[in-house]
Regions:
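Hydrophobic alpha-helical transmembrane segments
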Residues: 66, 81-82, 113-118, 138
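Transmembrane and membrane-interface helices of multi-pass
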Residues: 105-125
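TM-lumen/periplasm interface segments of multi-pass membrane proteins
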Residues: 1-109, 128
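Multi-pass, polyprenyl lipid-linked donor-dependent membrane glycosyltransferases
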Residues: 125-139
Length: 139
């Protein structure tokens, strides 16, 4: 029963928001391109990177390019799924932390965060961050 209710709670906001859509996560491809350039010994900042039919600069510090190297070593789909799962997990963890501080008397912060997570995922800033493959949640 609990699993059924949790499933409805998880899917309902997504359906209200328009249902499934696959979007090209352009930002993650910029991160991957910068990391690949670093691996090739190229200057990160003297060129643009062709992603999604446009040219974008790498605007992050060199340390970021080093941290993005694992993304450059795997196919786009693997990088995207890994990045998205990490973002969702960290968003959940942020919800747990906020609940612990905002409502310390609640019995199970992790379970409540799990119930809140689907609603947080369809909030415009979070939905767009994940849709574009941005780094915001991971920071």
């Amino acid at each position: 029963m609990i699993a059924a209710v949790a499933s409805v709670v998880a899917v309902l906001p997504w359906l209200i928001d328009g249902g499934p859509s696959i979007r090209y996560a352009i930002d993650i491809d910029v991160y991957r391109a910068g990391a690949a350039a670093l691996l090739d010994g190229d200057n990160l900042y003297t060129r643009g990177y062709e992603v999604g039919g446009i040219t974008l600069p790498f605007t992050y510090p060199p340390l970021a390019a080093m941290l993005f190297i694992p993304l450059a070593l795997v196919p786009y789909a693997v990088a995207l799924v890994t990045w998205t799962l990490a973002s969702v997990l960290l968003l959940w963890w942020c919800l747990v932390i906020v609940l612990r501080h905002a409502a310390p008397r609640l019995a199970d912060h992790r379970m409540i965060a799990t119930w809140i997570l689907p609603f947080a995922l369809v909030a415009e800033p979070v939905r767009e961050t994940i849709g574009f493959g941005q780094i915001n949640i991971l920071l």
